[in-house]
Structures are given as structure tokens and as C-alpha cells.
């Protein structure tokens, strides 16, 4: 499974519905679980800044991640941005692989 991060900004009219926030959030999560049962949520945070929420979740592929984003946009999000997260150890492995290739290519000159 791949790790994804979803940053959302709610539409202004939805942001004003503070008393209904828990219900709206539960409805969104239930819909995602129904439409994307393969997605596993890891963390959910409310943010102070340009985005309202950050979700960290695992999904098998980019198509599943796109569905989560589209469900968010169809249910009150004004903006949704999905990022793929690479585990740090895996990232370090990529840097070693690239370094070897760069070194090999530079010796070809």
C-alpha cells in the first residue's frame, strides 16, 4: 500500500456549520469507506493555516487516492490536494540508486 496525504480546504458555507462539524465529518468518512473500502486511514488532523484538514491514509494506487479527493470535493471541500508520501528509508534507497547512476554516467565522459 502507498501512503497519501490529503489536504482540504472547506467551502466557506461548510466552514460556518461548526455545530454540524462532527456529523459532516462522519458522513464524509462513511462515504469514503463505502466507495473506497481498500483505503485505510492512519491519521486525521484539523489545521491552523491555509488548509482546514490533513488526512494520512494508505491506498493501493493513485486511482483510489483520486477517488478520496473527488469525494471530498463533492462533499463540501472547496479545495483538495493529494500528495504521495515516500517512507524516509525508501527515499534514502532512491538517493543511493541515483548516486550510483550519476557516478557511472559521469565516468562515461
Segments from the language model and where they lie:
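Short S/T/G/P-rich N-terminal loop/turn motif that feeds into the first structured element of a domain
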Residues: 1-37, 89-109
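Short, well-ordered beta-strand segments in beta-rich or mixed alpha/beta enzyme
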Residues: 5-9, 45-68
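Glycine-rich, flexible loop/turn motifs
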Residues: 14, 44, 82
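Short, glycine- and small/hydrophobic-rich beta-strand elements in well-ordered beta-sheets
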Residues: 29-53
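Short secondary-structure transition/capping segments
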Residues: 51-54, 83-97
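An amphipathic, aromatic/His-enriched active-site/gating alpha helix that lines ligand/cofactor pockets
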Residues: 59-89
Amino acid at each position: 500500500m502507498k501512503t497519501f496525504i490529503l489536504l482540504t480546504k472547506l467551502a466557506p458555507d461548510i466552514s460556518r456549520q461548526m455545530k454540524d462539524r462532527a456529523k459532516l465529518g462522519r458522513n464524509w468518512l462513511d462515504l469514503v469507506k463505502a466507495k473506497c473500502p481498500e483505503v485505510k486511514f492512519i491519521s486525521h488532523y484539523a489545521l491552523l493555516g491555509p488548509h482546514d484538514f490533513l488526512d494520512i491514509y494508505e491506498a493501493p494506487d493513485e486511482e483510489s487516492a483520486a477517488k478520496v479527493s473527488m469525494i471530498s470535493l463533492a462533499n463540501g471541500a472547496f479545495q483538495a490536494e493529494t500528495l504521495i508520501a515516500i517512507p524516509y528509508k525508501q527515499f534514502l534507497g532512491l538517493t543511493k540508486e541515483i548516486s550510483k547512476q550519476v557516478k557511472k554516467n559521469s565516468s562515461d565522459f
